[in-house]
């Protein structure tokens, strides 16, 4: 008797379909972000990975309660598929400007609406899809920092999502 062929199961709305929500470039960018957060490179993001990631961004005194709340957003261990699913759920129906602003807010723990030029430049030239010196030069020409060396990220977010600078009233 010949072995039965296994039927392919499809899960509608399940985690296996999360890969269809994003194109290959986006998935690769999420993979790079996952790798940056997975500090110990074990393929799972845990509380210590989050703590180390915050420390790398200069935020040293993150409370356990805050980390626990982040970990509870997942139903179990956070591997790449779970990570992608979590982002897919958060991004579904979200305003792109709000999503991008939210990403910048992570880098602005004091909620000032600005990020230090030096810190942003370091991130953009050393992490994931690295900016060239020419791209950095163009960015500062388009979004010059203030006299204190701070960059208004809300204007950057607006331009990314709308293609033109906000009118200063």
Swiss-Prot record:
InterPro entries: EF-hand-dom_pair (IPR011992), EF_Hand_1_Ca_BS (IPR018247), EF_hand_dom (IPR002048), Myosin_RLC (IPR050403)
Tissue specificity statement from the Swiss-Prot or TrEMBL entry: Expressed in fetal and adult skeletal muscle.
Residues modified to Phosphoserine: 15-16, 75
Annotated signal sequence range: none
Pfam families: EF-hand_6
Gene Ontology BP term (one): actin-myosin filament sliding
Disulfide bonds: none
GO MF annotation: an example: structural constituent of muscle
Clinical disorder: Arthrogryposis, distal, 1C: A form of distal arthrogryposis, a disease characterized by congenital joint contractures that mainly involve two or more distal parts of the limbs, in the absence of a primary neurological or muscle disease. DA1C patients show multiple congenital contractures, scoliosis, short stature, and segmental amyoplasia. DA1C inheritance can be autosomal recessive or autosomal dominant.
Function, in words: Myosin regulatory subunit that plays an essential role to maintain muscle integrity during early development. Plays a role in muscle contraction.
Summary of subunit composition and partner proteins: Myosin is a hexamer of 2 heavy chains and 4 light chains.
Record protein name field: Myosin regulatory light chain 11
Organism of derivation: Homo sapiens
Gene: MYL11
């Amino acid at each position: 008797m010949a072995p039965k062929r296994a039927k392919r199961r499809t899960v509608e709305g399940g985690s296996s379909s999360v890969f269809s929500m994003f194109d290959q470039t986006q998935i690769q960018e999420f993979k790079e972000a996952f790798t940056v957060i997975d500090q110990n490179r074990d393929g799972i993001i845990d509380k210590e990975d989050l703590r180390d990631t915050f420390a790398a961004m200069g935020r040293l005194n993150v409370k356990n309660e805050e980390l626990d709340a982040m970990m509870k957003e997942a139903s179990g261990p956070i591997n790449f598929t779970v990570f992608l699913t979590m982002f897919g759920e958060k991004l579904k129906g979200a305003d792109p400007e709000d999503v991008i602003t939210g990403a910048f807010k992570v880098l602005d723990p004091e909620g000032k609406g600005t990020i230090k030029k030096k810190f942003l430049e370091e991130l953009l030239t050393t992490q994931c899809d690295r900016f060239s010196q020419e791209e950095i030069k163009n960015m500062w020409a388009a979004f010059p920092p203030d006299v204190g060396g701070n960059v208004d990220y809300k204007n950057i977010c607006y331009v990314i999502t709308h293609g033109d600078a906000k009118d200063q009233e």
